[in-house]
Amino acid sequence: MPYAFMPKLSQPELIFDKNKQWLGETMKGIKEDIETLQAQKLGVMLKPHIWVWNGNFTGDIKMFSEEDWIQFEENYKKYILAFAHLAESMQVNLFCIGTELNSFVNQRPAFWCSLIDEVKSVYSGDLTYAENWDTHTEVHFWDSLDFIGIDAYFPISNSKTPSLEEAFLKWEILKENLKAYSKEFQTQVLFTEYGYRSIDFAGEKPWVSKRMKDKANENAQLNLLMALHQSLWKEDWFAGGFLWKWFPYYNSQSDEHRNRFSIQGKKSEAYLKEFYADH
């Protein structure tokens, strides 16, 4: 998961593959990650992200002049094609051309069609794009990709600890729209991200990731994950998903991730090991 950095939502500069970044965000680090995963015979999606200074939402990126848009497009293309070349050279299964860029996608449709063509000229694997759960229907180029990518932080429950039944019934409702959308484009839906924090009310606003001192609640996380899997995983229009998130150097003696998205050292970890073994 490489990262490029933007100083402001309206500034076209993109900074990536620099020594001051975390190794895992750079070309060298991503290559090492891919090698590690492939050695374990795991399929890999390479999914570039943008981080805007102060944590501003990438879906709100917007330039205020044509000149800046053109410059930003050139910078973004350079970023994406650099990692598309890496994905091809390492035979990565799936490449994601962008993550949660709603405003950029809607305001510059011609650029995205051109970018997809250029990526296809250098990368021969499957392609997707990751749009946020509430704006995935605004993407105009799904029929040019192999999967409809959704970062699936749908609101599921307002309960402190959602029951498995409650969360399952909510997914049974949500999945009807997803199924219809998949049928419209004759393309499978892929959850390019899904997951829940292990906190009270984890299903209320699953996208919230601020480092708050929320009370840990492993059962909430577990029930929400189980419900999603039970409702969706056997559907033929659904391609599966990528769980957010996993730390390579997890310290089981630390409470740092006790109320975070990671399942490591929690009830969900034992469940996921069994679930993935059967799927």
Short names for language-model regions:
Residues 43-53, 94-105, 113-137, 182, ...:
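Aromatic-lined carbohydrate-recognition surfaces of secreted/lumenal glycan-active proteins
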Residues 10-20, 202, 206-210, 222-227, ...:
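Aromatic-rich peripheral "rim/lid" segments of glycoside hydrolase catalytic domains that contact
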Residues 16-21, 68-71, 98-105, 157-170, ...:
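Surface-exposed cleft-lining segments at the edges of enzyme active sites
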Residues 150-165, 180-222, 244-260:
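Active-site clefts of carbohydrate-active enzymes
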Residues 28-39, 78, 82-85, 110-121, ...:
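Alpha-helical scaffolding segments of alpha/beta enzyme cores, especially the outer helices
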Residues 53-71, 145-147, 205, 209-210, ...:
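Aromatic- and acidic-residue-enriched segments that line the glycan-binding/catalytic groove
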Residues 1-14, 25-105, 201, 246-249:
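Substrate-binding cleft and catalytic face of glycoside hydrolase catalytic domains
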